[in-house]
Amino acid sequence: GSEMCIRDRATRVVQDEQTKIFSAQVWAPEKPYKFKKKTFKPTTNPLLIYECHIGMAQQEEKVGTYNEFREKTLPRIAQEGYNCIQIMAIQEHPYYGSFGYHVSSFFAASSRFGTPDELKALIDAAHEMGIAVIMDIVHSHAVKNEVEGLGNFAGDPNQYFYPAPRREHPAWDSLCFDYGKNEVIHFLLSNCKYWLEEYKFDGFRFDGVTSMLYYSHGLGEAFCNYGDYFNGHQDGNAICYLTLAN
């Protein structure tokens, strides 16, 4: 791994065990994973959702894997009667302590937990059990890192983000997307399409929606009545993006 900018649409990113630097990797197995369950229609009446984190969904003192979740945890979830799992943020992220919410590579499934094919096998197995899979997708902000992330992509610190003073999130130590830019809208919408088509996720739970919708990011807001929700302090560009994504 060397300190070179990772392209914004890298679909596989790994960390060098010695240098700790993240680098893009070509993922082209001789036999790409083929889904056994070609089509899947989730049961939604009612939708019983089990929220989970791949790395923490086991009892051992280590980071869990896609395979371990598929082999050990999925059967227990099915046995308990759930028909949907919501996987907490798995887009590639440099800091594990962020639980996956400081994303650096938006098109890459975190290599901490295994390979892209192993994640596909997990989703395929869930569908075979009648379990829908929702992805906790992070489009509300991005990690500030410049080597691993988009913080200074192609030498432009504002290519994807608002300029100061709106560039940095006041509470999350991260960068805020500028939803008024066409390239940002296209980037994020194509990201949604990628996860649905490549991995066959059944839908999304959008993280940090309040932060996206309000200029205040919801900080210091009580939201006690309708006037608090519709007070004129909403970001119309963010509303437009979420409408398109939906």
Go through each PLM region and give its residues.
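Polar, glycine-rich mid-to-C-terminal structural blocks
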Residues: 237-245
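Hydrophobic, Leu/Ile/Phe/Ala-enriched alpha-helical segments that form helix-helix packing faces
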Residues: 77, 245-246
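Basic K/R-rich, polyanion-interacting modules in nucleoproteins and related proteins
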Residues: 7-47
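Substrate-binding/active-site clefts of carbohydrate-active enzymes
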Residues: 38-44, 53-234
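Active-site-flanking beta-strand signature of metal-NTP-handling nucleotidyl enzymes
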Residues: 49-51
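Short alpha-helical segments and helix-capping/turn motifs at coil-helix boundaries
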Residues: 35, 71-72, 244-245
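Short, small-residue-biased leader/transition segments that mark boundaries at the very start
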Residues: 1-5
